[in-house]
Amino acid sequence: LYDCDVIATASQGKLEKCVELGADFAVDHRKEDWHKEGKKTATEISKQKSKESEIDVIYEHIGGSHWNKELSLLKYGKTIVTTGATTGYDVMTDLRHIFFKGLNIVGSTQGTRAELESGLHWMARGKMRSVVDSVFSLEEASTAHQKMLSGKDLFGKILMKP
């Protein structure tokens, strides 16, 4: 979209889908050393483009289990945007990772109206799209909720329609 190189993280079964959706590379975040593979990939990209190896922004929604590894990937002045905490809200952070590197930590939820309009602009031009996993009627709300809780074979949003 903005000439970014995108390294997505996902479970093994979702890696191919991430690339199909436009990620340049995908790394299995369930591997113990996923962050090292992500850093190695960023270094390979930078060599191809003759630029300094950096990860400029991390969009973080997993929380506790990945937080410190993600912070370790960022260089001075870079940004982590946290949008959720799937694996837990409480983290122990070595503050030196933040102040010595001058990191920016940004919290985000639903976004502003202007951001929604920007997203719709890109969607209308085919540059972005929503990924819908499944659609349920209101009568199937319990089934939809169970699917969401299980997380099995889930890739994208679950929609409810009247």
Give the residues covered by each predicted segment.
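Adenosine-nucleotide cofactor-binding segment
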Residues: L1-H66
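Terminal peptide-recognition signature
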Residues: C18, I58, E70, I105, ...
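Conserved helix-to-beta-strand junction in the class I
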Residues: S72-L74
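C-terminal hydrophobic helical "lid"/dimerization subdomain
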Residues: R113-P162
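Short glycine-rich, flexible loops that bind phosphorylated cofactors or substrates
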Residues: S65-W67, G88-Y89
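Rossmann-fold dehydrogenase core element
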Residues: Y76-T83, M92-S134
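A general structural signal for well-ordered alpha-helical segments in protein cores
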Residues: H35, I55, W67, L95, ...
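Residues in the short beta-alpha loop(s) of Rossmann-like NAD(P)-binding domains
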Residues: Q12-G13, T86, G111
